[in-house]
């Protein structure tokens, strides 16, 4: 890795593959051995990109030299990136983006909290869309987006009786943190969210709509979608929750966001407010700790307190805990569905199901 002040250069002569070739253990060890800090950030832009495959390969080669780790999606319609970079290479990375007109003057959303371990590898994928929305972009004007509001403006408009605050994230995100009095659609995906929004906001076309998401990208498409359906006063939080937290801190504003901000990297969350507004899905204790089930065949994301983590060995259900103690070959058979055709391993609204399972069955049997 290049030292601060040195422009990183590729020194090897052998052509390197333009994808990760190492396992998680090696990647984790490398990350732990780094003796410098990293900056976690995100950015996006809707912009027409040409020769996407060629661009993807160029970016991978250039960003690998800079030590970039993260998840980046590029498509004909633009780029969506969540990544970490050695802090001493941040200026070089900015210059790299600015060297392409499509990415010039990109706005970064810097993480509110950062342990320098948000990502293990560089994963740069070509997608049909940079956000999976299920929409036909030819059917409406995707550029006719809502008005962008600063944190101060967003707070002010929240006081308006005619305002409706709408969370444009999935239910497992809003569960651990959201704005006061916001509508919280119980969706698993952004595609589903857009359909639910029209149902929840039916008849409120003349209200002031205040939308927000993590970094702003989902609001771009959702606001245009609502305006297409006749909503006249559609607004969105500029830069999302991440930028809101920074502006509130810098200007000494009141934070109307309660709890934590869910993030799609190794951190899983970052503190915005001090409140814990969610509960353990297994015992009901106050908790906002997201984990993945330790059963490799499940790996579902759910909220688990330290006590239940010890009791269930990090698993979401007794079934998964039992699977965890089976021989490895038997576990593989289960994951393939050979021994469990009706298995419980599903991400679709699994989180509330876990809660219902434990409150409805385990708690009832203990009385």
UniProtKB/Swiss-Prot annotation:
Q: Which reaction does it catalyse?
A: uridine(34) in tRNA + AH2 + O2 = 5-hydroxyuridine(34) in tRNA + A + H2O
Family matches, as PANTHER family = TRNA URIDINE(34) HYDROXYLASE, UPF0176 PROTEIN YCEA
Classification via CDD domains: RHOD_YceA
InterPro entries noted in UniProt:
Rhodanese-like_dom, Rhodanese-like_dom_sf, Rhodanese_C, TrhO, TRHO_N
Task: Pinpoint the Rhodanese domain residues.
Answer: 159-253
Q: Gene name, please?
A: trhO
Biological processes per GO annotation: tRNA modification
The EC number(s) given in the record are: 1.14.-.-
Stretches assigned to coiled coil? none
Give UniProt keywords alphabetically. Oxidoreductase, tRNA processing
Task: Please explain the role this protein plays, according to its UniProt record.
Answer: Catalyzes oxygen-dependent 5-hydroxyuridine (ho5U) modification at position 34 in tRNAs.
Q: Does the keyword Oxidoreductase apply?
A: yes
Q: Does the keyword Oxidoreductase apply?
A: yes
Name the protein family. Belongs to the TrhO family.
**In the UniProt entry, which residues are flagged as the active site?**
213
Spell out the Pfam families in the cross-references: Rhodanese (PF00581), Rhodanese_C (PF12368), UPF0176_N (PF17773)
Q: Please state what the protein is called.
A: tRNA uridine(34) hydroxylase
Q: Which domain of life is it from?
A: Bacteria
Q: Which GO molecular-function terms appear in the entry? A: oxidoreductase activity, acting on paired donors, with incorporation or reduction of molecular oxygen
